[in-house]
Amino acid sequence: MQKTEQDIDKTNIAAYIQFTNIAPGATRNEIEDHLELCRRYDFQAAMIAPCWIPLAKEMLSGTGIKVASFLDFGMGNAHISGKLVMLESLMTLGVDEVDYAPNMGFFLSGMYDEFRNEAELMVKEAGDLPLKVMLQLGMIKSKSEKVRAIRMLEDAGVDWIKNSSGGWPPGATDASVEDITLIRETITGRSRIKASGGISTFDQARALLNAGASLLGTSRGVEIVKGAGAAQNPSKEWSKPY
């Protein structure tokens, strides 16, 4: 259900945020700090790299905060056999939600059957585990082809469709009201929407939720909750909002 501006304010927006730290050089201490912030602000989920899932499960136990992770981030061109093994591994670790990158090369080549079949196999392997697909809308040039990709993924049974991976590889674009609206107008309601990429202020976050997103992926969760925007965030390696 689409939210209204009256429904979303600084007191409840944390419930829509998957607070993200997937920095390749993130240390254990940095991840522990990240998870403490998840607890303090009661974010919907902590999005962290697979290697930190056991730590996150331990630190967030009993909080109701979900542990989310990813596979084949950005690239999406691992063979499906490898993706299925990675998904099984994440499930064994106890992950609550998984974001995965589809093979955009298949779609852009017109290999639509292969693109859809990959999604169907991932959905089958995931079972009841919420699965989000990082559709790189910025790589698709025409609106009609964007609609085709969205419909294929929903028809395959994917639980969530994202506008992009959020920050990498080149071609991954920031979340926009236009893209979120397009997804909302295309899906039938079987899939839900997660917005990702460049989300750094409260007003931006609220606009994306009002456009149809039900989750936000961002490394700027604290700034958004405080309504401060990205200006207060110190410059760091891998600082692009996810």
Pin down the residues of each PLM region.
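Catalytic cores of alpha/beta
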Residues: K57, A78-T92, I140-M152, E185-A195, ...
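Conserved N-terminal beta1-alpha1 strand-loop-helix module at the mouth
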Residues: M1-T92, M152-E154
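Structural preference for beta-strand elements that scaffold enzyme active sites
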Residues: A14-Y16, A45, G64-A68, E97-D99, ...
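Glycine-rich, proline-tolerant flexible connector loops at the mouths of alpha/beta enzymes
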Residues: L35, R39-L55, F73, V98-R116, ...
